[in-house]
Amino acid sequence: PRALRLDKMSLAALHATLSAYLDAEFAAREIPTLAMLSASEDELHAKALRLQKLLADAGVSSQLVRTGDAVGGGSAPAQELTGWAVAIEPGRLSVDELEEKLRLRAKPIVARIHRRQYLLCVRTIREEDFAEIAAAAAEAIR
C-alpha cells in the first residue's frame, strides 16, 4: 500500500539514525537518552556539585543526595540506576509550595519530591540549564 512507501528523505533519516547506533561510543555521547543512561555515578556526582555551587552562589541552600534513578518505560519498567540529586532547602516555603512555584513558571522546572525533599535529579538536567534553575530557585524562595 501507498501508506507504507518510504521516500528518499525518510530512508536517509533512518540510515543516519541507525548509523549513529553502530558506533557505541558516539551513540553514548551524542544521543541524549543514551548519554543520560550511560553517565557514571562519578560524572553525576561532579555534575551535582556544579549545580549545588550555582545554587549556593544564588543564595539557595541545598545538599547532595544519592538517588535511585528510574529508567522507566516499557523495556525497563523496574530498572534503577544509581544517581545523584540536589535537594533544595525550601526556606520559608513548604516543599509542595516550592515544587508548585517552580513547576508553574513559563519554563517549568520539574523535580521529584521524595521523603519531603525537593530533588533535582541531575541525570536528566542539561548543564546549560543550571544557571536558570539556580536563579528560579532563588526567586521562588525569596
Features from the language model and the residues they span:
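Active-site C-terminal subdomain of aminotransferase-like
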Residues: 1-53
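Short phosphate-engaging motifs
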Residues: 10, 94, 129
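Conserved C-terminal alpha-helix-loop-beta "cap" of PLP-dependent enzymes
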Residues: 41, 45-126
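Charge-rich, low-aromatic oligomerization/scaffolding segments with amphipathic character
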Residues: 129-136
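Catalytic-site microenvironment of enzymes
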Residues: 139-142
